[in-house]
Structures are given as structure tokens and as C-alpha cells.
Amino acid sequence: MQKRKITKAQTVAIVAVFAALNVITDSFGGLPSSGIWSSWNFLMEPLTGIILGPLLGFAATVMGVMIGHYIYFRDAYEFLFTMGAPIGAAVSALLFRGKWKPVLGYYTILFAAYFLTPVAWQLPFWGMWDTYIAFAILLVVIFLIKKGLWKHESTRLPIVLAVIAFVGLEADVLFRIFVFIPCQTYRLFYGLNVEDLQYIWGSGAIITPIKVALSSIATVTIGHPLLETLRKAGLLIHH
């Protein structure tokens, strides 16, 4: 049977819905406020990319977090850091579609930038343990893609969604770390010293992975039935 082609109007409507959901989740403060994210938008980030694709997912997330940041204003600098959210959505979208090369390049470049920054040598290595696990998982996913084993059948879809949410959110984390450490905004924006950073690295190593786990659960719980419904209705965006 020939697949039904989604119309432009339907695409615009779906993008608008996800942009609105990103606005809503970004307009409320998260608990606790420490860690990478200060709102609940991390729950929507991977799912937006998975459903909409890398470009539309990026666009919907940008619109959502920018409006959300105006509604729930943190500070002017957060408008820069929150660009990690659309990047995370795009990474989730790329990996879901088996496009691993941009994701591998992104992780490699941002890790290199961090570890080549002198102040990073004074921070606890274990403080970014979740990003290391994400990178290791990414390498496993790449192996599976190359072997033709990266399948999205209904029985495997929950695992695929959980993995993609994890890798996508950690890509967001890496962007914010890149802005904070290699770009020196910890000093230029906030006037922090090494002792301050060491405390932040210690607390973030606990809180951030908990939020990533919550998002992975939400992505599987919502994403699995939603993807099946969109596929049956012929409304799944493939690009």
C-alpha cells in the first residue's frame, strides 16, 4: 500500500503543537533548580526532534524556549545557554533516523574543546560521568546502525526511544558546558572561580542525570504510542 504523504498544512499544524508544548514546559520552573535545566522543557526536547525531524524539531524547540524564556525570565544569558535545547532535539532526530555522523562529530568536537581548556583540568573528571556514558552508548548505536540492527519495530521502539532521549539530552548538556567552560562564560558572565565550578560540577553530577532519566521515561511513555498513532494516520514526518 502506498504511504500517505503528509500535507504542508498538517506539517505546520504538528510543528505548531510541539512549539506550543515547548513554550508551556519552558514557562515553569523545575524542581530542584540546580543542574543543567531550570524548567521542565527537558521532558519535551527529545520527543520534539524524534517526531518532527532535525530541522523542524530544531525550529519548534527554538520557538518554544525563546518564548518560554520571556514568560519565565531567568536572566539574559540563559537565552544563549538554552540553544542547547534545539541542538538536543536535532541530535535526537538525527539518531532516530540513523544519521550518526553529525552526532559523532558533534560529541567529539565538544569533548575536545572541553578537555583542551585548562580550567577543566581542575574540575572533577567524574562530574561529567553521564556524558561519557552517552558517548559510549552512541558508539554502540553506530555499530548497530552499520550492521543494520538499528530497527524501530514496535517491540524494540521503547529501548530505541530511551537511548535516543539520553544521547540527545546529553548533547544539550555538552553544548551548555561548551558555552560555560571553553567559552569562559563562567568568568565573563558570572564571575565564578575554580572553587565555585568544583561545587557546581559536584551537584550537577547528581541532579542532571536524574532529569535525563525522567525525560527518557517520558519519551518512552508518550513517544511509543504517539509514533504508532502518527504512523497509522500517515502523519509521521520523515525528513
Regions found by a protein language model. Name each.
Residues M1-H239:
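Loop-helix junctions at membrane interfaces
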